[in-house]
């Protein structure tokens, strides 16, 4: 009987041995991953590596007991807060958090591997913004906007949208019921004489779109204001750093125009402008309204955009159409094959290529006010151009403008003398 009891005691003690081996293995693993500095001698005459290993072995019982108490207390707290099924909810939450953190880590790893081509100041913020305002959600909204509406329902639906959104139905070229879907309504054309060129002189700059001036000024560094209080990298935004051809007489200037949903969604040439290069940079579709831009840097340099680079009277000019949330579609009249917000493409700031089209032999020649392209549901136009030091702005941030209205220029306004000079086509 005694031998049996002794055998039973030995048998009951056996399960404790693997636990000791696990703790020893864990301690060895932790210590083996310590930095080389940890192998230095401690005040006790042994290396920190060995000292840590021995301390873990000495206090292994306390560590196990503390771990058990922590798990027990955590389980009690979760059950009290979330009910009997709280532990399962917590498990799902912790799993989701682990997956999210893994994707976050991988996103930052990709940004670092591509040498941060967009010069993003906070990759973590961008990651979580992508979760909220992803390209897929913009495409879904675009699909909904392009659903055909029954002719009998178009007039009441469009009039409700117009009254809520502040759309002026009197200036729309065609009857409301002629627009098949909401997307077509936002891409509407205007009646003749609804917009005029205020200054036809070659020394001035006309507004390329209806909207609000959110920022303007001189380019003094590689980072430019997208709105007061937030900046973006000009080099990443354009794909190059623009240079002033005549630094003694000229300087680089910029202006940002935000198109609201109620605005006319087409954009026009701001001056007599020859386009030599067109660059399409794939990107996000993050919101571009002022209150959002104030809180986050680098929105312009990561959003999808089409950059038209060329020359005007005083030197270089870059006209950039920036996509926004629910506005993945950017259409350029002279490049009908251009497609934006496409599926399964590598975004520029994640290492994707820039689609470049050059027209050095036969550049696109635009006259002031000539139609260039259109958005869907509002977005942003950015102008970066070379101008003389005595170029003055006629507008201020926060001021609303209309197509053809003078943004600034050199000297007095030159008014149109004939009907042909004053009007331009919206077709």
Swiss-Prot record:
Parts of the chain on the Mitochondrial matrix side: 78-88
Pathway terms, separated by semicolons: Phospholipid metabolism; phosphatidylethanolamine biosynthesis; phosphatidylethanolamine from CDP-diacylglycerol: step 2/2
Reported modifications of this chain: Is synthesized initially as an inactive proenzyme. Formation of the active enzyme involves a self-maturation process in which the active site pyruvoyl group is generated from an internal serine residue via an autocatalytic post-translational modification. Two non-identical subunits are generated from the proenzyme in this reaction, and the pyruvate is formed at the N-terminus of the alpha chain, which is derived from the carboxyl end of the proenzyme.
Enzyme Commission numbers on file: 4.1.1.65
Residues bearing the modification Pyruvic acid (Ser): 379
Superkingdom: Eukaryota
InterPro entries xrefs: PS_Dcarbxylase (IPR003817), PSD-B (IPR033177), PSD_type1_euk (IPR033661)
GO cellular component, one term: mitochondrial inner membrane
Span of chain positions assigned to the transit peptide in the UniProt entry: 1-77
Transmembrane segments: 89-107
Free-text remark on how the cofactor is bound: Binds 1 pyruvoyl group covalently per subunit.
Catalytic residues, chain numbering: 210, 268, 379
Pfam family, one: PS_Dcarbxylase
Biological-process GO terms, alphabetical: phosphatidylethanolamine biosynthetic process; protein autoprocessing
Coiled-coil regions, chain positions: none
The entry's keywords: Decarboxylase, Lipid biosynthesis, Lipid metabolism, Lyase, Membrane, Mitochondrion, Mitochondrion inner membrane, Phospholipid biosynthesis, Phospholipid metabolism, Pyruvate, Transit peptide, Transmembrane, Transmembrane helix, Zymogen
Cofactor: pyruvate
GO molecular function: phosphatidylserine decarboxylase activity
Catalytic activity: a 1,2-diacyl-sn-glycero-3-phospho-L-serine + H(+) = a 1,2-diacyl-sn-glycero-3-phosphoethanolamine + CO2
Site-annotated residues for Cleavage (non-hydrolytic): 378-379
UniProt subunit comment: Heterodimer of a large membrane-associated beta subunit and a small pyruvoyl-containing alpha subunit.
Function: Catalyzes the formation of phosphatidylethanolamine (PtdEtn) from phosphatidylserine (PtdSer). Plays a central role in phospholipid metabolism and in the interorganelle trafficking of phosphatidylserine.
Protein name, per record: Phosphatidylserine decarboxylase proenzyme 1, mitochondrial
Gene coding for it: PSD1mt
